[in-house]
Amino acid sequence: MPRSFLVKSKKAHSYHQPRSPGPDYSLRLETVPVPGRADGGAVSAGESKMEPRERLSPESQLTEAPDRASASPNSCEGSVCDPSSEFEDYWRPPSPSVSPASEKSLCRSLDEAQPYTLPFKPYAWSGLAGSDLRHLVQSYRQCSALERSAGLSLFCERGAESGRPAARYGSEQAAGGAGAGQPGSCGAASGATSAGGLGLYGDFAPAAAGLFERPSTAAGRLYQDRGHELHADKSVGVKVESELLCTRLLLGGGSYKCIKCSKVFSTPHGLEVHVRRSHSGTRPFACEMCGKTFGHAVSLEQHKAVHSQERSFDCKICGKSFKRSSTLSTHLLIHSDTRPYPCQYCGKRFHQKSDMKKHTFIHTGEKPHKCQVCGKAFSQSSNLITHSRKHTGFKPFGCDLCGKGFQRKVDLRRHRETQHGLK
């Protein structure tokens, strides 16, 4: 094997040796022919005064390229190689054959130079009329609005197909005339909402009204109230008719109105309890002591305190004691002589609203409470309860001195006064 292959070359490569532009470097640049020129000559004297860094800068390349292309007879207009087309002769970094010193000098010139912009052609907006520009802006805004409401529209469309609440509410709203939307259309997307955010719930109000409507066959309907199952049955004489049970949901203000007596409630539960207690005749909670019935379990618990002997509520004016706080509050109206409830027929005033309603039955002759045994009717429920004790023989009031029982409390008081001399 020759020794020339074993000995490393002592001659350094040309690209490892630093090159400094000598006095003849600019002369060689002047004599370099430019391929884009028509005469194929060298660089002119005016261009020779420009430094090499400036001739290689991006600004010089971007500005001089169209000039040289326009002066060239060999230029191919309309083709890809056309310098005046979109594919202009942009500046590119030097090749790796340049020395490291020249690369450093070029990079320094690029860092010092200002950032350049690509020569994009400006869009001719002046070619469009004012109406065309407005049409473009409006179409863009409509597309943005459709993108924002895409999820809501998708929910409404799926609700119309699968029977979701949105489609069901929309169809009932369209059928009831509350809104102009079709079944499955979303009222929130159309922006038809009332002040205060009530429109969002007002759209669904007709559907909620069906919760309180009872058909004529509501005799076997099962009611739920605080864990108690209330079964309405015609066999026990419960009055359940649609004209008494039908209620209406008002759209304004979120109030619930009974169409039988026009009483307004703030919650649907309050309206349901009112209909069951006042109009349906369903009073399933009965007292074991006196047989009095109540429409609510809480009312029965409060009533049981009447049969006990404990009187924990005392009047500070006269010293009279009561078993219930509500009875004491009613008693205090006697001392203040406050009678806020007048009769609409004779003008007589009462302390309690219930006393005023009982009094009005005298003028109207109405007797809504009827005995199930003999058919006798009474204007007050208390009179019906006292009358029913004649059929059952129940005597809840007993004398503590002789043990004699009575059906009415007034009879016990009279017995104590006449027989025992007590007041």
Swiss-Prot record:
Protein name: Zinc finger protein Gfi-1
Disulfide bonds: none
Zn finger intervals (C2H2-type): 256-279, 285-307, 313-335, 341-363, 369-391, 397-420
The species this protein was found in: Rattus norvegicus (Rat)
Domain of life: Eukaryota
Function recorded in the entry: Transcription repressor essential for hematopoiesis. Functions in a cell-context and development-specific manner. Binds to 5'-TAAATCAC[AT]GCA-3' in the promoter region of a large number of genes. Component of several complexes, including the EHMT2-GFI1-HDAC1, AJUBA-GFI1-HDAC1 and RCOR-GFI-KDM1A-HDAC complexes, that suppress, via histone deacetylase (HDAC) recruitment, a number of genes implicated in multilineage blood cell development. Regulates neutrophil differentiation, promotes proliferation of lymphoid cells, and is required for granulocyte development.
Tissues where the protein occurs: Restricted to lymphoid tissues and testes in adult animals.
Signal peptide interval: none
Ranges annotated as biased composition (Basic and acidic residues): 48-57
One GO molecular-function entry: DNA-binding transcription repressor activity, RNA polymerase II-specific
Keyword Electron transport: no
Main location: nucleus
Domain text: Zinc fingers 3,4 and 5 are required for DNA binding and for interaction with SPI1. The SNAG domain of GFIs is required for nuclear location and for interaction with some corepressors.
Location of region: Disordered: 1-102
Gene name linked to the record: Gfi1
Region spans: SNAG domain: 1-20
Subunit structure: Interacts with U2AF1L4. Component of RCOR-GFI-KDM1A-HDAC complexes. Interacts directly with RCOR1, KDM1A and HDAC2. Also interacts with HDAC1. regions. Interacts (via the zinc-finger domain) with ARIH2; the interaction prevents GFI1 ubiquitination and proteasomal degradation. Interacts with PIAS3; the interaction relieves the inhibitory effect of PIAS3 on STAT3-mediated transcriptional activity. Forms a complex with EHMT2 and HDAC1 to promote 'Lys-9' dimethylation of H3 (H3K9Me2) and repress expression of target genes. Interacts directly with EHMT2.
